[in-house]
Amino acid sequence: MPAIESGLLALILTGVLGYLLGSIPFGIVITRAFGLGDLRRIGSGNIGATNVLRTGNRPAALATLLLDSGKGAIAVLIARAAVGEDAAQLAAFTSFLGHLYPVWLGFRGGKGVATFLGTLIALAWPVGLACCLTWLATAAVSRISSLSALMAAASGVVWMLLLGQGQMAALGLVLAVLIFIRHHENIRRIANGTEPRIGKKASQDQSAEQ
């Protein structure tokens, strides 16, 4: 963790801003804008880009991915520019929490992977890029989005230490633990060999998850 040098009020304000940005449910907004219905009633019911992809609409899934990662990155960049590095890490954490527990959806949100990657890219782009490449490499081999997410999250702290960003390690560990908790059902299905693979549409995924 960086040294806490900013004032309490500044940290509170950037933390709240990060949470509010993170809590914007772009997956729901995008699917409705594309006329795809309520994302919470599609596939797994998750509000993230992977579930949007289950509609078969790749542009909508890409837009969701970019916006979910972008909101985390923007929260970090605003906090860093306005306050400092301690506020930037706080905003990364609160924007991530906002995606997981959005006030607008009764605190029932997504799993946070895109927002996690967005915050890392903004905090230290080499670490963020390394985690993105870890996700892509795992996805190319396994074709399982959740496994790719878990590998990216687990590798985050390792990349932070290897790339000279040890001051981010505590944050990276907390975010990784939360991602694993949010993926507990996916972990069970991975162990059972029943986790759906990337590219399957909603009807296929629902039958696989029943």
Swiss-Prot record:
Keywords: Cell inner membrane, Cell membrane, Lipid biosynthesis, Lipid metabolism, Membrane, Phospholipid biosynthesis, Phospholipid metabolism, Transferase, Transmembrane, Transmembrane helix. It comes from the Bacteria. Its EC number is 2.3.1.275. GO terms for molecular function: acyl-phosphate glycerol-3-phosphate acyltransferase activity. Pathway: Lipid metabolism; phospholipid metabolism. It is a multi-pass membrane protein. The chain crosses the membrane at residues 10-30, 59-79, 87-107, 116-136, 161-181. It is found in: Cell inner membrane. GO terms for biological process: phospholipid biosynthetic process. The keyword Lipid metabolism applies. InterPro entries: G3P_acylTferase_PlsY (IPR003811). It catalyses: an acyl phosphate + sn-glycerol 3-phosphate = a 1-acyl-sn-glycero-3-phosphate + phosphate. GO terms for cellular component: plasma membrane. It holds the Pfam family G3P_acyltransf. Catalyzes the transfer of an acyl group from acyl-phosphate (acyl-PO(4)) to glycerol-3-phosphate (G3P) to form lysophosphatidic acid (LPA). This enzyme utilizes acyl-phosphate as fatty acyl donor, but not acyl-CoA or acyl-ACP. PANTHER family: GLYCEROL-3-PHOSPHATE ACYLTRANSFERASE-RELATED (PTHR30309:SF0), INNER MEMBRANE PROTEIN YGIH (PTHR30309). HAMAP family: PlsY (MF_01043). Probably interacts with PlsX. Belongs to the PlsY family. This is Glycerol-3-phosphate acyltransferase.
